[in-house]
Amino acid sequence: LLGAERMIERYSAKIEKRPYYMAEQILPYLEQLQKNGITAQKDPLRVTVLFSGDTGFYSGCRKLYVALQEAVAVGALNAGVRILPGISSVATLAARVGESYEDAAILSMHGKKLNRLSTTVESHEKVFLLTSGSEDIRKIGHLLAEAGLTDCEVIAGYQLSYPEESIRILTPGQCEEITEEGLYTCLIRNPHWQPER
């Protein structure tokens, strides 16, 4: 079982677990298993890589999939590869708060700068955001306040699907005070949105 530490820690120690989630870590590991003959057993070895969130939306899953397919194509790896999607954090938050998302903008701050947040919020009633943690929540609050979007409501889904899950309804100012680390997915509601012209 491979994946980020937080993804694999809950699973039994009866199976081999490695905190690998990047292609650069996983490919050498799989190639070594194959070299050691472990994959040549009568019953094929099954290796699972866990990713959080949506497998098709700013996920490391795509990069790993491409790398695995390339390794199979050149004969470096004898494997079958398939993706089994989970439930995205956007879908989870939308369900928790009874909101649709077919008419929402969906953006990611996960590991990158988001320069167009205020213009997107100005032109959409609903904006869902994937974040990297509390620092991004503070940035959201700062960007909204700086753009004069202080009437917006920020619904922060904290640790969705984990036992400590909570839904927090915040003002931009309250966002700037968030310090609790963890996984956040946000929904920003703008009561004064105007469609783009």
Locate each region found by the language model.
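Class I S-adenosyl-L-methionine
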Residues: 1-81
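General beta-strand structural signal in soluble alpha/beta enzymes
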Residues: 2-4, 49-51, 81-86, 106-108, ...
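Short, charged, surface-exposed secondary-structure boundary motifs
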Residues: 9-13, 25-31, 91-94, 113-118, ...
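Short beta->alpha connector loops
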Residues: 20-24, 87, 109-113, 133-135
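Predominant activation on well-ordered alpha-helical scaffold segments within soluble catalytic domains
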Residues: 27, 31, 62-65, 91-95, ...
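Short, surface-exposed amphipathic charged segments that create phosphate/polyanion-binding patches used
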Residues: 30-37, 42, 96-99, 118-124, ...
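A contiguous loop/helix-start segment that scaffolds small-molecule binding in enzyme catalytic cores
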Residues: 47, 123-197
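Class I SAM-dependent methyltransferase SAM-binding "motif I" and its flanking Rossmann-like core
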Residues: 53-124
